[in-house]
Amino acid sequence: MKRILYVLALLILTNGIWAQKTIIEEIRKDKNISGGGYYAYPYPEHPLPSLTPAPKGYKPFYISHYGRHGSRWLHDAKQYKLPVESLTKADRYGKLTPRGREVLAQLRQIQEESKGRIGELTPLGARQHEGIAQRMTKNFPEVFRGKGLIDCKSSVVMRCALSMLNEVKVFQAFNPRLHVKADASQSDMWYMVYGNEKANELERQARDNELAAYRRNHMHLDHFLHALFTDTKFAQDSLDIQNFTGNMSAIISNQQSHDTDVSFWDLFDEQELLDNWLCDNAFWYVARSSSPISKGYMPHLAENLLRNIIESADKAIADGTCQANLRFGHDACLMPLVSLMNLGDYGAIIDDLEDLPERNWWLHRIIPMGGNLQLIFYRKKKSDDILVKALLCENEVTFPIPSDLAPYYHWSDVRDYYLKMLTP
């Protein structure tokens, strides 16, 4: 019996080590993955996902979508300001390495360029959405034919509206006869961008407790500090090291949002690259997914959105006037939606944050900059059977129900499953 338990324990440990090796291997291939939620949308720079052909006779006729805005500037000016102040202080005392002085000069330039741009969409972010729309029209041209309606709605935040407009111009160029509506109204935010104080309080509690403990266990700063400071004790004693490293992590991770050759990934060794990813990954699982730490509450933030998706699809199927409902918002809305729908098992309940990597709960595959969910609806002549396929960041993902045609599912089954789940 003891031998069996030992073997089981060894298998569990080995699986955990294997999972971390897997994500390390991913990061070795592309250090930008370390940025987690800052990860720039990977296509077309990476090989495009292959799509399973539809069953014989079925053609796409409708798309329902929710997308995160594209790559952006950081959303708080302090994220640029505070690292400059910290490094300037260290420089006054002669405590910076040559690389540290170079980083300070680069950060001053970045801070200057950020003025008036905080939180705004970058040119790369605009191109990401152009590419997403172009592939949508290429993969599903039937949806964008004729004179039908493409109904686009956006968060009232400018970067989301601009993300929407960069897709709109692609649809209009593809087929000028389309009726493309684009709107950004506070009247739609009750389902487009929903949050409440309960979620905020659960997030605050987790930040102060479980997430703080997790970060302490995954904060290896030796290489990072030695790269910047000649006296790391000075840095730890004289600077607000937690705020400094947090803001530096944001800048380093978000450099990929810009068309620039300036990179700071060399400041991290391999363990620190992994830690950077692990901490962001854990944060998002707790803050907007199914974590027991946040009482499994966060997916419920997307209930209004899921109802809107179902009701909009019902209307499109019934009257045939709308060919696509496209919604443009934020990571904090897309994540709860994917978790609520449990697409690709991303709504899994995982008790231990250390198990996230081995369970393939990988943030950068869910909500990178420009991340999106596309539900593609299919039908065939002389049949009432509607099929639906889910694409998460253009990759086929499963619904949490059986299907004889996976990755295609009978819409009636999907609809019934989610309506029962939404019923109080």
Q: Positions of the model-derived regions?
A:
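Bacterial Sec-dependent N-terminal signal peptides
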Residues: M1-I23
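Signature for phosphate-centric chemistry
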Residues: Q20-D151, S155-N325, G329-P424
